[in-house]
Amino acid sequence: MAIFKVNGQSVQPEKNQKLLRFLRDELHLTSVKDGCSEGACGACTVIIDGKTCKACVPDTDSLDGREIITVEGLTEWEQQVYTYAYGKAGAVQCGFCIPGMVMCTKALLDENMEPTDDEIRYALRNNYCRCTGYVKIMDAVRLAAKILKAGEIPDDGDPNWTLGNRVARIDVEEKVLGYGKYPDDFYLDGMLYGVALRSKYARARVLSIDTSRAKALPGVEAVVTAEDIPGENKIGHLKHDQYTLIPVGSLVHYLGDAIALVAAKDRETAEKAIKLIKVEYEALPHVHTIEEAAAPDAPKVFDEEENNICAHKHISRGNAEEAIRNSKYVISHHFETPWTEHAFLEPECAVAFYDEDGDVFIYSTDQSAHQTLHECSLLLGTDKVKVQNALVGGGFGGKEDMTVQHLAALLTYVTKKPVKVKFTRAESLLVHPKRHPFYMDMTMGCDEDGNIMGVKASVTSDTGAFASLGGPVLERACTHAAGPYHYENFEIEGTAYYTNNPPAGAFRGFGVTQTCFATETLLNMMADKVGITPWEIRYRNAIRPGEVLPNGQIVDDSTGLVETLEAVKEDYDAAMAAGKPVGIGCAMKNAGVGVGIPDTGRVKLIVEDDEKLHIYSGASCIGQGLGTVLVQMIVTNTDIRQEDIVYERSNTWISPDSGTTSGSRQTLVTGEACRRACEKLDRKSTRLNSSHEWISRMPSSA
């Protein structure tokens, strides 16, 4: 076996394996993140003999005599520089990609202290970041180069932690240096690894399941099927329509449906066992398009439903048909948007175990710990369940639905041992809900000056194999389809269909993105037909405070569309005059639950034995920086110093439920709850001596 050095220490793996697995599973160097294991994402980047390399690519046997450096092997000075640079530049969000980016930065700056922008881009070319768009990461590289060349970190003085000031995030160090723990970074004594057997068909009936050969495989601790579930088998974000494990005699709805689970001593053994499970199916006709799903004789995705319609929405104001008929200009067009993958860098992972209270404890990476608690408790048939968010490597809506948490909990319940369930990137792509594909037919009428007279639209969406959030997504798509414009006549009819495709659910924009694309494109077409610029047609129709949107909402003073358009006009006109036209588009989106539903945020402030104020909230921090905002909120509204405040990650036994982290709502509603809790604290006290919980209930608007 090969002998090589890792961070200056000689090591000799006992077996040939991927370097990534050796670094993580045996040396527990968890700064080396596993984002894909396919040589694609760059989250596992290390330095080998001065050059960057993705650790998931080389086998350990190929590394004899080589020298490997991970973030853990950086000098103390280098760690300080990169923490400062990435924090100061605002380059860290979910943080999952950052250790890999740091290693790319080090390899570049070790050779070139004055890199050009092109050289920085080239150095980072193999590393993905889903959150930032790379601009801030490039800023961090430039700043790190400047500091390394100067030989000292700038003295910025004490930062001002009140709202409105720029500060480094409270979690920047643990994310830059890679010691902050995502669920996959937990290695517990005696931990097993869980893997699911998934359906061979998109639609079929399971006739029998034979697990005998899998159970006999050495290293297998348990093989679990539907009959082993102690509580409710079905889960679902709003509607419980998805089997955790498909029972014999029931239908599978898509290729991601799980049939059985295996818990084994390692993932390799679990994967071998999965292949030994024999499932007999009756393959059935399936539907993969809306046309197929809507056909009168279409196979039903759910036997118990009358048809394949998941949700229907109709909104009408004024008389759109008459307004369009009387318009000077009329344009009709068909638009389509595709399925879209969230592409968060951290694949779904959960670790479950029995804690000292005899509760099933789950470390999860999701957008609502309390939602996970609810569904796992129903599955296990017990309220002795706890959930805590570890670090979350991005969500964007894709981690609102259950994926791995309940599987880890079930295997722990059965085996009484710690269990880790982690998706491969291929599983993640298959299983978790995607952005809905939309098919839209839209007609717009305008007068001779380009003023919108009326819009009529018909939209359909493919919500896949389960309801997930298909109904609310359709509702947002329809209520926002009119755009941020002022006109009286609007009608839209929307239908979401079940198919045997992977489910579709929440994704940033939540349905608004799709119809906004259609409306804005149609508006550009109309501007061309009327003979005015895309800027001008938007300005003439822009909604102003006090006016009524086509969906019936009265706009308040917070709307600044006119001012925004005016602010860009000079640059827009200059680009057009220079023959370098730029695109322009307008959009509106609810902050919070939306459609008039009251929204709730909760915060609990507790002075612990360390005499520091601890912030507890059930709101998940998925990279958006909620913890930093809440700390700033307290500093702004009290005399408590930042160093006397501790932000606790969301859990379900102390942190009050603050709803799902979605809809850009947490700073608004949970932040307001935090502000109100601050009012209960003694602003003038030098010693913290109280604890308060406050609930913020706020009306939501589109």
What residue ranges belong to the model's regions?
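Short, surface-exposed loop/turn segments at secondary-structure boundaries that line and modulate
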Residues: 127-132, 136, 224-257, 292-293, ...
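Alpha-helical support elements that line or immediately flank enzyme active sites
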Residues: 101, 110, 196-226, 261-280, ...
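Intrinsic disorder at enzyme termini
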Residues: 124-183, 565-570, 574-578, 604-613, ...
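Single conserved hydrophobic/aromatic residue that forms the stacking wall/gate
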Residues: 688-702
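Helix-loop-helix junctions that connect adjacent transmembrane helices in secondary transporters/permeases
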Residues: 297-378, 542-612
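Glycine-rich loop/linker segments at domain edges
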Residues: 90, 165, 171-177, 238, ...
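Flexible, low-hydrophobicity surface segments
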Residues: 145-310, 330, 414
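Signature of N-terminal electron-transfer/Fe-S-associated modules in redox systems
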Residues: 1-156, 595
